[in-house]
Curated annotation (Swiss-Prot):
Entry GO terms, CC: cytoplasm; cytosol; extracellular exosome
Residue numbers annotated as active site: 1158, 1297, 1299
Family according to the record: In the N-terminal section; belongs to the FGAMS family.
Binding site for ATP: 322-333, 402-404, 706, 911
Gene giving rise to this polypeptide: PFAS
Entry protein name: Phosphoribosylformylglycinamidine synthase
This protein's UniProt keywords: ATP-binding, Cytoplasm, Glutamine amidotransferase, Ligase, Magnesium, Metal-binding, Nucleotide-binding, Phosphoprotein, Purine biosynthesis
Described purpose of this protein according to its UniProt entry: Phosphoribosylformylglycinamidine synthase involved in the purines biosynthetic pathway. Catalyzes the ATP-dependent conversion of formylglycinamide ribonucleotide (FGAR) and glutamine to yield formylglycinamidine ribonucleotide (FGAM) and glutamate.
EC number: 6.3.5.3
Residues reported to bind Mg(2+): 707, 746, 750, 909
Natural source organism: Homo sapiens
Listed GO biological process terms: 'de novo' AMP biosynthetic process; 'de novo' IMP biosynthetic process; 'de novo' XMP biosynthetic process; anterior head development; glutamine metabolic process; GMP biosynthetic process; purine nucleotide biosynthetic process; purine ribonucleoside monophosphate biosynthetic process
Reaction it catalyzes: N(2)-formyl-N(1)-(5-phospho-beta-D-ribosyl)glycinamide + L-glutamine + ATP + H2O = 2-formamido-N(1)-(5-O-phospho-beta-D-ribosyl)acetamidine + L-glutamate + ADP + phosphate + H(+)
PANTHER family attached to this UniProt entry: PHOSPHORIBOSYLFORMYLGLYCINAMIDINE SYNTHASE (PTHR10099:SF1)
Amino acid sequence: MSPVLHFYVRPSGHEGAAPGHTRRKLQGKLPELQGVETELCYNVNWTAEALPSAEETKKLMWLFGCPLLLDDVARESWLLPGSNDLLLEVGPRLNFSTPTSTNIVSVCRATGLGPVDRVETTRRYRLSFAHPPSAEVEAIALATLHDRMTEQHFPHPIQSFSPESMPEPLNGPINILGEGRLALEKANQELGLALDSWDLDFYTKRFQELQRNPSTVEAFDLAQSNSEHSRHWFFKGQLHVDGQKLVHSLFESIMSTQESSNPNNVLKFCDNSSAIQGKEVRFLRPEDPTRPSRFQQQQGLRHVVFTAETHNFPTGVCPFSGATTGTGGRIRDVQCTGRGAHVVAGTAGYCFGNLHIPGYNLPWEDPSFQYPGNFARPLEVAIEASNGASDYGNKFGEPVLAGFARSLGLQLPDGQRREWIKPIMFSGGIGSMEADHISKEAPEPGMEVVKVGGPVYRIGVGGGAASSVQVQGDNTSDLDFGAVQRGDPEMEQKMNRVIRACVEAPKGNPICSLHDQGAGGNGNVLKELSDPAGAIIYTSRFQLGDPTLNALEIWGAEYQESNALLLRSPNRDFLTHVSARERCPACFVGTITGDRRIVLVDDRECPVRRNGQGDAPPTPLPTPVDLELEWVLGKMPRKEFFLQRKPPMLQPLALPPGLSVHQALERVLRLPAVASKRYLTNKVDRSVGGLVAQQQCVGPLQTPLADVAVVALSHEELIGAATALGEQPVKSLLDPKVAARLAVAEALTNLVFALVTDLRDVKCSGNWMWAAKLPGEGAALADACEAMVAVMAALGVAVDGGKDSLSMAARVGTETVRAPGSLVISAYAVCPDITATVTPDLKHPEGRGHLLYVALSPGQHRLGGTALAQCFSQLGEHPPDLDLPENLVRAFSITQGLLKDRLLCSGHDVSDGGLVTCLLEMAFAGNCGLQVDVPVPRVDVLSVLFAEEPGLVLEVQEPDLAQVLKRYRDAGLHCLELGHTGEAGPHAMVRVSVNGAVVLEEPVGELRALWEETSFQLDRLQAEPRCVAEEERGLRERMGPSYCLPPTFPKASVPREPGGPSPRVAILREEGSNGDREMADAFHLAGFEVWDVTMQDLCSGAIGLDTFRGVAFVGGFSYADVLGSAKGWAAAVTFHPRAGAELRRFRKRPDTFSLGVCNGCQLLALLGWVGGDPNEDAAEMGPDSQPARPGLLLRHNLSGRYESRWASVRVGPGPALMLRGMEGAVLPVWSAHGEGYVAFSSPELQAQIEARGLAPLHWADDDGNPTEQYPLNPNGSPGGVAGICSCDGRHLAVMPHPERAVRPWQWAWRPPPFDTLTTSPWLQLFINARNWTLEGSC
């Protein structure tokens, strides 16, 4: 048995917000607590016979410790408990290796520590009390300190990672021939197969006809592959509603929407992703992805891909992990479109129950409601699910650009409770694909079956069936634990690079077919991949993360980050080389046979070689699965569902007498569906990839309000795609048809603010979340589907894909609590010009902006199901509706024409919160007042202002006002002039009148504070409260940033000379890097010859750096930053002899430069290339293979979380060659990092660096001065330091991302005169590097 070594690490004094949150949570539960001390323990599985040598121990201690300290790691614990202390150790469940362990092991291997095969991290706490703590105190502390779904308590230090007991084989037969249906019923119960009575009868009869018993693995396989989750029985079934047989299935009805829309789908209803006809674009790609090579410009037809799905059950059980794997699964859906596609950007949405935030009263939340123990509380879902989705996207490198968040917990008039106990975690994704890769090839005998991605773990066994249980909570809790998955974005990123290499292969894509692994695991994905030809699969050929896995687990576990593909044998070497270069496992697990059967051979005892030869087994090898594909995947009898409508009990809305507009706003503006989503947008990357033209945040204060997300199809073009969301589930409690129409209307009134090719080109993903098999709900879903189909036919848009989740109910005690029926519409389309987008922020204060209101259901002011009703714990009777779809068609057309002619300044849709909220949000985002008068006689004020009838509010300038009004009115639309903008600034007044009577008059900053309050309350629970309070105070007073280009600033221009000199720069990336493509674009735009180089290339000797003048160390999360920011990357450079020598030689050459951004900045600091003692020789790095003693490190942001901000920086004087001529400029730039706080080894060193101009970049406040104010300084670095350079100026390390702002359309906000720039000032940084290389400087 391998020994487990323990390395204890004490806190270094700057650990982010987590310890503070932990302390506050503990003190809230244990008032008698007097003190908390913590340490980490790295539990290292050491497989060598001898214990680590002194040198190996030194490496391990360097990896685990802080390089600025010498004594923070020990082999014995730092925490020695006294008699009144409680010592607790918690960490991950040990049933499989965590992603953290996987990445640490990768680092260890890169540094020559081969005997390390597992490293799990535990947290240790010493809690001090005045008296000896009781067992009850220990139980409370343990419950507070760990997540029972993914973690466990360790009463003693870990001594072994070997499981205490081996799982049962579970390969035996189920005795249907002897016991009939009873045998299958027993297996159904024991394995949690979620088979209903129809399934039990069907499979019993089938195996009796075959005259054989199914194996346990086959029964499990059938349950997963044919679960509601996978087969969509309800949508494809025969429905009877109130005794009437529906002519078409719901799926057929949805497909019929294609008949009234333009035929621009190149893929629809397949692959979990759809695609529409795109455009010809120019783009960069490496010449040869199997080796280091230069980027070259190519041109081709790129289509737009979209997919959306939900991950509700796992998120309800374990919010963080469920959301990470939901995001990862949807990313794989995009990857696996056709024969491989490009991931570009994501969307996210969350629906949860009443939050019950401690100390924050939301009057509509009922404190008497009880919550089940097997689901996370809504507050945990709101924070941790969004943390999980954000963390996965951040580390993978996919920006999240749009979304929604909604809460509901309400008792209906009939006594029924409706709440999202089982939450919604929605994930959408937009991507692109080459036209040549649309169609998958049919499987042919002899094709190789390959699994690419992470090894097999005992994760998510039974997830597909578990999520199909009719009412969540009816399954056993053990099986709920088994269905939880955990994500590894680092592995997914490596897998994505393998797929992208195939897609970009110069001699053609070797992938014949590609499918992502999800519900049902290998059993499902390998059947889909091999259908209809059939395949033989061998268990010995899978890479196992756990040798104790049985055949059922190998076949059925939903371990994440895995895809399956087919390729022809001649392309085997290509895939092998790419996988090795990207360090991503690729396992050739079987072969297409052509016999139309799927056969799993368990040959682990006696492996069968690839050529079919091998040692003769003593007995025939077991085949846990041997099924005819037609029998499993072929057309099966439709299930019939007999449904009854159950009309809701209605009560008129009864608002308090004399309720003022301000009093109503005090509630409505704090409702999660209406309130600011800043707590979501600030922690998720919105710029990575460099293809983002419009993300959520708009205006001078970056207010999270954008209606539409826009991306480019290439860095080189203004052609792109737009997507927007629509969902109105609360209205479904009154009328599901209305909710469906409004979801479509909301998606289109959001999308309308981006210029698209044509309304009839718009396609939609429809995602249905409903408790469809409970009384009344299935009929409601059918009605909603009918209404959606009808309104889409009238509008000319169509559905081309989607998913369903039909078990949206949970058991709470003896009560079944259903979620509201929900339809999420994701509309998407091609953008011919990504710059022709309008945002909601008012842009022309001081009365220069005129406000227009286009009502799409004129004369209607219904309050049923609105935010106002919900805030008074009611629904009301009559919901708003899209009464005249033709109005939306005309309004869409007119608005698009105005965008094309650049006649609109801003625009926003009327939705949650009504007209008054729409107007206020535009003022909030523009940071200015407004003065409006709504002329609607004979209607009460609250109905006029808070009805959520679909509509648009627009800002136009005086010269264009008459023309805009005329265009709408000539189209027969109801277009009212409401008023104009007011003064600028947070103290400007908002004055709202109805029919001439003033009903609201308050400073915009005060109203905005109400709107931001719920978000800041949630933020205090996920970030350092002092930082949150600082941002909240700042928003009340800020005017907005001021940018500055001094007169001496060079006039940046794109080098145009054909055939001119192109210095060579290496875009160097490591495992987990994700900022390489935008970096390549920036250097290419500046005239460099740009090369794609990996650390593996340097380690293997595939290339050296002698011919390169520059190296760019890119952003991302190398090795997921598991040991600290860029620590793994620094270890690979320091301890790998070949790679380290190559980089040392490069640095010593006087004709070279380097740029480190974000993760690259963290790396250069660790290596000592920047930040060392200015008085020492900068060319010396110390002896080979010895870590540098850095002068500074990049540590956790003071906020304690990842920060995504559009911040300002000031360029100062100094020797940095890349910033020459830019001194004095104050420019906005993307910031996206979790560890950017510059920790200097001493105040003296900081003073020397500042005095010598070696910190040439500082975070700037709104006046352009260096600042430590949060969030203007997003990480809290002392003195506002944002960048460091070497003494000779050749090496520059910066935390912000100038490479994501080299094109004007990449900017998040451009005030005059920057809004007319055709070239971004940030391009000058890269041009400076080129100019320096051409000068021949040494």
